[in-house]
Amino acid sequence: MKKKIFNLLTGMLLSCALAGSTVAVQAEEAGTDTVKSYLTGEDVSVGIGHRRPIAVMLGNDTNGAPQSGTENAGVIYEAPVEGSITRLMAIIEDYDNIPRIGSVRSCRDYFLFYANEYDAIYSHYGQAVYALQYLDQHLIDNLNGLTLGNAYYRSTDRVAPHNAYTDFSHLQAGIQSQGYSQDYKEDYNGHFQFAPEGTETTLDDGVSANVVKLDNFAYNHPWFEYNAETKEYSRFQFNAPHIDQNTGNQLTCENIILQYSNYVPYDPNGYLNVDTQSGGEGKYITRGKAIDIHWTKDSQWGITHYYDSNNQEIQLNPGKTWVEIVLNDSVGSVSLQ
């Protein structure tokens, strides 16, 4: 990680003049022990900001929800898997004091590429066979519950396979047993661009997006509702607020990215080969508005970048982000109000 470009005159994130885009570096202010989070653009302690996050696979059917630890995630991916259900991947940087995280479920190969965009340590319990070609080659640091019994435990309040959980001590045991570095790579400069401090992205030319319905996910039918007072979106699914089981609090976020993606079936069993590299269209949603975007990626293991209609990289508002992977043949089932 190219750590700590600090401007003694401003103590702020450096920014580009073109389109106001923010340079994706962490800035450490004089006399403080905080840096800007790569996940949220908000202040976090130096220890948390320098440590690689975890990217945890979470079940999202009625047996797996509500999940635990989701409220602590800076970024959450939702993507379809076989059987019309979705899986979540929660990317968490500050997991030291979360009572439990889970339930942890198995890997699908496209989630590996999303996790790598954040230089995260990938947490999963088993995998679909199509992911083995990447896991067996150790192309991404990962903690597999099938082979690392010290990284997870089984709870007694749910039945298998919906009762695999982890926490700080278990994750650290797994990470240390594998010898993984917990520091960001030297050349990692973050994923998102965030609005410069003291400003916000308002999408004044966007369309109304006070309610975002994702009926493309026909099993859980999730949606988001915007609260203008808090400037956050509240998440719902299964006709009820989507909560974190640890706290009972409803999940919220400042940013929603709809990433439209091509795919082909792997086999008749419904396993999906989601295209994470070729690019496509989408939406960026914040502050009750939405704009059209397009996304690009220079390699399978690279980082996705999102651009507006003027081909300028979008700037997220600091805070939490949901990335919704929408298959191209189901875009028509997404609605904004």
Predicted feature descriptions by range:
Residues 2-27:
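Sec-dependent N-terminal signal peptides of Gram-positive bacterial secreted proteins and lipoproteins
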Residues 28-77, 82-337:
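A surface/extracellular/periplasmic glyco- and lipid-processing/surface-interacting theme
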